[in-house]
């Protein structure tokens, strides 16, 4: 349950400018990770540019923030198009004067046609790579250019616990592992510029994209999908988008100002199954 409602002008991100890529969400019940992060950042005082391929969904997120008294705007960008990502970063700086936080929260697996090694097609593989990995790289490229010039900033990339744990679908696992490797390189190469970069590794999170895709792919009810996923988590339940958003907020805030290059699992202990 979200217990942090209300805009906080003197909050942990007070006066900061945050771009959230993937701030809309897929159709279905519940809250998506990107929308939750955008709302959470705004509640802690950030100006938020909600970026999504579906402008209506981004506008919905921005409207939710503004209704609570926060500061937000919506922007349409497809992460497979570099120039649109560049425009998003430029818009944030032009509107609010800086770019302090970039949160990349885009990824597809089953919804993008992923499969096991013997089933995946070249087109499916390339499409998922463009969304999951290339989009993150080029969003960071254009954010870093601004952050270097202004003397610092924070990047929080969303990878996945699937990058390190068991996962049956080849492209999602490979691309999310790539996000970890890229973020480590990003952190090391940009530390001299005052830029921090970290990853979040969500586990089984009850978001519209994750649950709805499996309802359709497995021909199961919502209750069946949820029960199966809950049983795989040592803490006995799926996480929520707010769990991921709270981790993103911590890494984006000055509380984490000596943390860079890490991968923070938000998975209810699921990666412990590797031990």
Regions found by a protein language model. Give the residues of each.
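Substrate-binding pocket helix/loop in short-chain dehydrogenase/reductase
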Residues: 113-117, 121-126, 229
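Short C-terminal tail/terminal secondary-structure segment
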Residues: 2-8, 114, 231, 237, ...
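Residue(s) in the substrate-gating loop at a strand-loop-helix junction
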Residues: 160
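Alpha-helical segment proximal to the catalytic Tyr-Lys
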Residues: 108, 145, 188-192, 257
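Canonical Rossmann dinucleotide-binding motif of NAD(H)/NADP(H)-dependent dehydrogenases/reductases
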Residues: 10-49
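Active-site helix of classical SDR
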Residues: 140, 175, 183
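Active-site loop-to-helix junction immediately N-terminal to the catalytic Tyr of the SDR YXXXK motif
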Residues: 29, 115-116, 166-174, 185, ...
């Amino acid at each position: 349950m979200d217990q942090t409602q209300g805009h906080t002008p003197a909050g942990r991100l007070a006066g900061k400018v945050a771009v959230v890529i993937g701030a809309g969400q897929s159709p279905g019940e519940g809250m998506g990770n990107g929308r939750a992060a955008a709302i959470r950042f705004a509640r802690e005082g950030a100006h938020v540019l909600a970026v999504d391929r579906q402008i209506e969904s981004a506008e919905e997120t921005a409207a939710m923030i503004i209704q609570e008294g926060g500061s937000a705007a919506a922007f349409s960008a497809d992460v497979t198009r570099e120039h649109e990502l560049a425009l998003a970063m430029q818009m944030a700086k032009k509107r609010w004067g800086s770019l302090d936080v970039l949160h990349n929260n885009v990824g597809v697996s089953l919804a993008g046609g992923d499969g096991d090694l013997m089933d995946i097609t070249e087109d499916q593989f390339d499409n998922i790579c463009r969304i999951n990995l290339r989009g993150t790289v080029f969003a960071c490229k254009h954010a870093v250019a601004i952050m270097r010039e202004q003397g610092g900033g924070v990047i929080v990339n969303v990878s996945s616990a699937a990058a390190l744990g068991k996962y049956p679908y080849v492209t999602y696992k490979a691309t999310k592992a790539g996000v970890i490797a890229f973020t480590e390189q990003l952190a090391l190469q940009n530390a001299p510029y005052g830029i921090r970069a970290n990853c979040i590794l969500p586990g089984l999170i009850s978001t519209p994209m994750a649950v709805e895709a499996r309802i359709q792919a497995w021909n199961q009810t919502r209750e069946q999908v949820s029960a199966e996923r809950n049983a795989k988590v040592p803490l006995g339940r799926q996480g929520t988008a707010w769990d991921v958003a709270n981790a993103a907020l911590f890494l984006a805030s000055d509380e984490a100002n000596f943390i860079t290059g890490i991968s923070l699992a938000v998975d209810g202990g699921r990666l412990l199954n590797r031990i």
